[in-house]
């Protein structure tokens, strides 16, 4: 009898929680709105192929509407901010530091649709995002000497990454790493320097083979992929057009040990097979499928995100994310968790 009473109470609790979550009059700062948002942000971060994880900044709007039978649709408009955690970093986004404004911050606006079945608790998520760096004018207005973002394929950025990685490999006797992705480059002043961030992967070849154009190196696949992430500053003492030779530099490379089964472990091969230059910001990705163009700059660039296969849903679902369900509602937008660009 006690077990039966406990089961009934549990059912009432679940039912009460669920009815709260699927009601249509949620305000942006309510707990239930935050739970839907967490689902959307987690999905976005798990399916980004390049760059950094993003953290919630503002819930701009939330609408929950009945859809078809046991389904409800949750429409979210979110403003996110770039963190300092690369997408391959297993650190939970809640523990990642949001990139501060003086370090040329980047924001991302996302339209998210969550299809939720109130009977089976299954869900399907769609997202459409575009990211934009803070303007150079804003950065310089608030901090005239702060470093400015450069395109990831800027020659000085690429040369600085190669210089630091070569120095890193020279110190290792049994391990050789290759650039997986250049994710950030910035020009610093007084003294003049280039700041870079890039991901590296251990490969199955020697240092000599690494520099042989006829030899193809591949990531190690034994149990774990040894992924690293480097932050480095190269102080330029030679003419700006020359490659680094004997420059002073500061670097910090950490090994992430991305284990098999991690949300991004299957993306490593995709990184290696593509150009190592990270796609930049400021283009739209619908359902996380978008071609990329590496000639763009930090201010006219784009995301390239993982393709998400059609999930368990048997009925027809909308392919787009309509604006007709995202009109402003009471209590929105919500509070700003960090800062506005």
UniProtKB/Swiss-Prot annotation:
Q: Which GO terms describe its molecular function?
A: cysteine-type endopeptidase inhibitor activity; metalloendopeptidase inhibitor activity
Signal sequence span is 1-19
Motif, Cell attachment site: chain positions: 23-25
Return the annotated site residues (Cleavage).
140-141
Q: In which tissues is it expressed?
A: Expressed by the liver.
Where do the record's glycosylation annotations fall on this chain?
A: 95, 204, 282, 293
Q: Which GO CC terms are listed, alphabetically?
A: blood microparticle; extracellular matrix
Q: Which UniProt keywords apply?
A: Disulfide bond, Glycoprotein, Metalloenzyme inhibitor, Metalloprotease inhibitor, Protease inhibitor, Repeat, Secreted, Signal
Q: Where does it localize?
A: Secreted
**Location of the Cystatin fetuin-A-type domain:** 22-130, 141-254
Q: Which family does it belong to?
A: Belongs to the fetuin family.
Q: Subunit arrangement?
A: Homodimer.
**Described purpose of this protein according to its UniProt entry:** Potent inhibitor of hemorrhagic activity but also proteolytic activities of atrolysin C and jararhagin. Inhibition occurs by formation of a non-covalent complex between BJ46a and the proteinases at their metalloproteinase domains.
Q: What is this protein called?
A: Antihemorrhagic factor BJ46a
Q: What is the scientific name of the source organism?
A: Bothrops jararaca (Jararaca)
